[in-house]
């Protein structure tokens, strides 16, 4: 690969693969520059959305140990390198795809597994980490309150029984 532009692009892709937690591959054909800019803005700072040559993405992925993307790397491809919450990014990409029919999610890679487009869309339907933890904490709090009431019940019942016996003796 004698082309210095390709070498620089490959080095950048390798760095992004090394720093990322998950990726989503998309097809951007038919999108305007304004739509792409809108998508980048919606994705936020934790996602690097880059258009790249498929051959360079394949090489960088192989060198990073990311497997299973070869079938997805056809046609014009843009890669969303996700450094944060993958669920939030999947939600943004799904909504953008619903609003812009030219935009297509091809698939992705998360936790050592290649993902199909349907799997990425299924991830978009999940609650994010914070919401899941809040639901878990709420469920635990409710059960702990019930348990505390259950443990306190025998003591209060004994106290009421003793008070009733005292009243009966006094009468």
Curated annotation (Swiss-Prot):
User: Which GO biological process categories is it annotated with?
Assistant: translation
User: Could you name the domain of life of the organism this protein comes from?
Assistant: Bacteria
Give GO cellular component annotations, separated by semicolons: ribonucleoprotein complex; ribosome
Which UniProt keywords are present, listed alphabetically?
Answer: Ribonucleoprotein, Ribosomal protein, RNA-binding, rRNA-binding
One Gene Ontology molecular-function label: large ribosomal subunit rRNA binding
As for family, the record states: Belongs to the universal ribosomal protein uL10 family.
PANTHER family in alphabetical order: 39S RIBOSOMAL PROTEIN L10, MITOCHONDRIAL
Oligomeric and partner information? Part of the ribosomal stalk of the 50S ribosomal subunit. The N-terminus interacts with L11 and the large rRNA to form the base of the stalk. The C-terminus forms an elongated spine to which L12 dimers bind in a sequential fashion forming a multimeric L10(L12)X complex.
Protein name per UniProt = Large ribosomal subunit protein uL10
What organism is recorded for this protein? Corynebacterium efficiens (strain DSM 44549 / YS-314 / AJ 12310 / JCM 11189 / NBRC 100395)
């Amino acid at each position: 690969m004698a082309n210095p532009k390709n070498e620089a692009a490959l080095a950048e892709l390798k760095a992004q693969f090394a720093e990322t937690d998950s990726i989503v591959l998309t097809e951007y054909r038919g999108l305007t520059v304004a739509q792409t800019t809108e998508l980048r803005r919606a994705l936020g700072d934790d996602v690097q959305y880059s258009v790249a040559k498929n051959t360079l993405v394949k090489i960088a992925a192989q060198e990073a140990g990311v497997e299973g993307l070869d079938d997805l790397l056809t046609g014009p491809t843009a890669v969303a390198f996700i450094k944060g919450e993958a669920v939030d990014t999947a939600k943004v990409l799904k909504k953008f795809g619903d609003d812009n029919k030219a935009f297509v999610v091809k698939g992705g890679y998360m936790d050592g597994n290649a993902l199909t487009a349907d799997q990425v869309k299924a991830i978009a339907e999940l609650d994010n980490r914070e919401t899941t933890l809040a639901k878990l904490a709420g469920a635990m709090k409710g059960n702990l309150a019930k348990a505390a009431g259950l443990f306190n019940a025998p003591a209060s019942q004994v106290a009421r029984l003793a008070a009733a016996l005292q009243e009966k003796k006094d009468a």
